[in-house]
Design a protein with these regions (language model features):
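A non-catalytic alpha/beta surface segment that caps or lines the substrate-entry region
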Residues: 23-67, 95-96, 100-102
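Active-site metal-coordination/substrate-binding segment of hydrolases
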Residues: 95-174, 178-183
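Short, acidic Gly/Pro/Ser/Thr-rich loop/turn segments
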Residues: 18-19, 67, 106-110
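Generic structural signal for well-ordered, non-membrane alpha-helical segments
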Residues: 1-4, 27-31, 35, 168-171
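Alpha-helical scaffold segments in soluble metabolic enzymes
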Residues: 7-10, 37-40, 174-177, 181
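N-terminal capping segment at the start of a domain
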Residues: 2-29, 157
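Generic secondary-structure signature for well-ordered alpha-helical cores
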Residues: 10-17, 43-47, 180-183
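Intrinsically disordered, low-complexity terminal tails and inter-domain linkers enriched
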Residues: 66-95
Length: 183
């Protein structure tokens, strides 16, 4: 199974920078390159009903993997809507509510997404992070005090010359890894 980190590092290599000059969805064709890769991955995993809209929205289904007739008693409470859908008899399969996960793939137009150079800072030491020594780009703890809370964690950073796209592409990597797990 591919890890979320492996997926994330792959996905950040796709330039999905948006362009505010266009009132289209997606605002750039290059966003479709990653969307098509995600579609291919979902199909390869065995997701059902994998489809992309004319606007680049990607959808897929993961079939339920529960058999409510053999679910433990405690689980029945968590599916409180099951009896409302007519599955109150013992031995009848309950209707389990669907759950959706959403993420976007476009990155901000303010900084390029081309030639992203991610790097993993292992066991972050709590000090300033030199993103790019040559260009003197440093992520200073004094400017980003939340970094103190991340001491000891592995961090994925860029070299400071591009966006990493971490908000969206990390979400996509997590969703895809979860999908693979359940499929």
């Amino acid at each position: 199974m591919t890890t979320a980190v492996e997926r994330f590092l792959k996905y950040v290599s796709y330039d999905t920078q948006s362009d505010e000059a266009y009132d289209t969805c997606p605002s750039t064709e290059k966003q479709l390159l990653l969307a098509n890769e995600l579609k291919r991955e979902l199909e390869e995993m065995g997701a059902s009903d994998v489809r992309m809209s004319e606007y680049g929205y990607l959808f897929a289904c993961i079939p339920d993997n529960t058999d409510s007739t053999s679910a433990p008693q405690e689980a029945e409470a968590s599916f409180s809507t099951a009896s409302a859908h007519g599955a109150s008899d013992v031995g009848q399969k309950a209707t389990i509510p669907a759950l959706g996960f959403i993420s976007h793939i476009d990155t901000a137009p303010s900084l390029t997404g081309t030639n992203v150079k991610p790097r993993i800072v292992q066991a972050y030491d709590g000090k300033d992070i030199v993103l790019n020594a040559e260009k003197q780009i440093v992520m200073k703890v004094s400017e980003f005090p939340f970094l103190a809370d991340l001491k000891g964690q592995d961090l994925i950073v860029t070299d400071g010359t591009t966006l990493l796209g971490a908000d969206d592409k990390a979400g996509v990597a997590e969703i895809m890894t979860m999908a693979e797990y359940f499929l």
